[in-house]
């Protein structure tokens, strides 16, 4: 035991030494980077701070970079949020010029903000999601970048504050109303331009398959066991309707997403704004985006709660539930090719195994179901975030925005990929479908009206026990003649109500 303890202590010491060396190397690399990068001095209320000269951000962004080193670049604030800030700040400058903002400064802000909206300045937005829950640092990131870029447009240097990030770019605004506003702008833009078109294409493709397969009668399955027949078209019609309803659900959330918090400022009262500012800026955003944004009916709700985002995420969660069911059904129906159900042939897109030659897997279905799992997880995060709106301000805004936008993008992209690389190329294996149909014992259900449930059950059990056909079992039990059986058991007549 003593020897083991000494060995463990020695190993622990070695690990500690390696860690110390690694940290020292990282510090040295950071120091070299510091010396090799030219800096300029920026100031905020905390005093001066060094900022890389090639970056447009200012003091508050730099402090956030130093204070929230969480997750690295992959955890950056989503690009749709950054672009939405560009839209909002451009519109704010436009409206503020009506209320006395120097037109020269206002026009420069609008030009700089347009560059942000177009994604031209993305490299100047380094902050991660994991920051203050109001998104203040990201709002200031936008203010500082736009202020410095506007100063350059006017022929001045970065950091001179000829255009001030607070007094000019953030005029009549608070992080508490700008961040929820860009959350809604980003979500609405992504839903209308990306998600809805993808889901519409998937719905159309599934509906097309439903029509293509409308005459193929197959055995149904409930509880994963044989059931009564239906057509493959009816089965795919169910999938198409699920997607259609999903589209309707997400569309029904948009009226709340179109309501903007801008003009509520710090706690919803509109302090430091002029009367009419909220209505005018919503109208300006609507004109800029060509989407029907309006000012929020109640600014206190718009700042303190994000029920609209939770509702939208809920619709995405429902869509994910539908898509997981659809993808699972399709891959199970395509299982095989020789030892599974094999009713469908799925497109063969790439080799499926590094050890089994010739194996091809339902990869699009697998990718889609993983996306659905992620979206369901995102909805949990959005739900928890939405429930933490204490008093006058929800302080989970960045994680709500990030998770919601992540879900929108994932469902949009995965739906498009699934439609293009799977659904569009699905083929029905008619021979296999027919074989399984006529082997099923559940065709016995059509005998119920003639011989009764108990006799029909006896026929099914006899056929299963002896491995014979239903017809043979019925005749052996003496409940039906051959002609009567052939008249009653017609799968094509079992796919709807009788006359």
From Swiss-Prot:
GO cellular component, one term: cytosol
Biased composition (Basic and acidic residues): 23-45
Binding site for substrate: 134-136, 164-167, 174-176, 222, 354, 359-361
GO biological process, one term: cold acclimation
CDD domains recorded: Fumarase_classII
GO molecular function: fumarate hydratase activity
Site keyed Important for catalytic activity: positions: 366
Localisation per UniProt entry: Cytoplasm, Cytosol
Active-site residues per Swiss-Prot or TrEMBL entry: 223 (proton donor/acceptor), 353
Comment field (misc): There are 2 substrate-binding sites: the catalytic A site, and the non-catalytic B site that may play a role in the transfer of substrate or product between the active site and the solvent. Alternatively, the B site may bind allosteric effectors.
Assembly notes: Homotetramer.
Function summary: Cytosolic fumarate hydratase that catalyzes the reversible stereospecific interconversion of fumarate to L-malate. Catalyzes the dehydration of L-malate to fumarate in the cytosol: required for the massive fumarate accumulation during the day in plants grown under high nitrogen. Also required for acclimation of photosynthesis to cold: acts by mediating accumulation of fumarate at low temperature, leading to reduce accumulation of phosphorylated sugars.
Family: Belongs to the class-II fumarase/aspartase family. Fumarase subfamily.
UniProt protein name: Fumarate hydratase 2
Taxonomic classification: Eukaryota, Viridiplantae, Streptophyta, Embryophyta, Tracheophyta
Gene name, Swiss-Prot/TrEMBL: FUM2
């Amino acid at each position: 035991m003593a020897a083991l303890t000494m060995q463990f202590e020695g190993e622990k010491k070695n690990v500690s030494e390696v860690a110390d060396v690694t940290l020292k190397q990282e510090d040295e690399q950071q120091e070299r980077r510091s010396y090799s990068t030219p800096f300029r001095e920026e100031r905020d209320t905390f005093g001066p701070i060094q900022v890389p000269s090639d970056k447009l951000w200012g003091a508050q962004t730099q402090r956030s970079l130093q204070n929230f080193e969480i997750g690295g670049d992959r955890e950056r604030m989503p690009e749709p949020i950054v672009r939405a800030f560009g839209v909002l700040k451009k519109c704010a400058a436009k409206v503020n010029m009506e209320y006395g903002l120097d037109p020269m400064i206002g026009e420069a802000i609008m030009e700089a903000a347009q560059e942000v909206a177009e994604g031209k300045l993305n490299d100047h937005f380094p902050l991660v999601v994991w920051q203050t829950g109001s998104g203040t640092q990201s709002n200031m990131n936008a203010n500082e970048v736009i202020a410095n870029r506007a100063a350059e447009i006017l022929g001045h240097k970065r950091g001179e504050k000829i255009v001030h990030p607070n007094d000019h770019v953030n005029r009549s605004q608070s992080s508490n109303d700008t961040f929820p506003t860009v959350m809604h702008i980003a979500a609405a833009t992504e839903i209308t331009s990306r998600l809805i078109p993808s889901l519409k294409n998937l719905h159309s493709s599934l509906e097309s398959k439903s029509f293509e397969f409308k005459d193929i009668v197959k055995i149904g399955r409930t509880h994963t066991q044989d059931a009564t027949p239906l057509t493959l078209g009816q089965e795919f019609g169910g999938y198409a309707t699920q997607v259609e309803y999903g589209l309707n659900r997400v569309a029904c959330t948009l009226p709340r997403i179109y309501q903007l918090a801008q003009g509520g400022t710090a706690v919803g009262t509109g302090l430091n704004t002029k009367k009419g500012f909220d209505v005018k800026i919503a109208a300006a955003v609507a004109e800029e985006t060509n989407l029907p944004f309006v000012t929020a009916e109640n600014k206190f709700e718009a700042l303190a709660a994000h029920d609209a985002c939770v509702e939208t995420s809920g619709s995405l969660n429902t869509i994910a539930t539908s898509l997981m069911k659809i993808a699972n059904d399709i891959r199970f129906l395509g299982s095989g090719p020789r030892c599974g159900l094999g009713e469908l042939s799925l497109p063969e897109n790439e080799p499926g195994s590094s050890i089994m030659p010739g194996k091809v897997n339902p990869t699009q279905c697998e990718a889609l179901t993983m996306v659905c799992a992620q979206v369901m997880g995102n909805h949990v995060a959005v739900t928890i975030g939405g429930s933490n709106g204490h008093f006058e301000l929800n302080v989970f805004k960045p994680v709500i925005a990030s998770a919601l936008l992540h879900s929108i993008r994932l469902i949009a992209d995965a739906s498009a990929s699934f439609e293009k690389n799977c659904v569009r190329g699905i083929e029905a294996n008619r021979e296999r479908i027919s074989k399984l149909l006529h082997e099923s014992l559940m065709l016995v259900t059509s005998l119920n009206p003639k011989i009764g449930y108990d006799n029909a059950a006896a026929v099914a059990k006899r056929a299963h026990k002896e491995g014979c056909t239903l017809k043979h079992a019925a005749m052996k039990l003496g409940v039906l003649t051959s002609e009567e059986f052939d008249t009653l058991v017609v799968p094509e007549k079992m796919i709807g109500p009788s006359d």
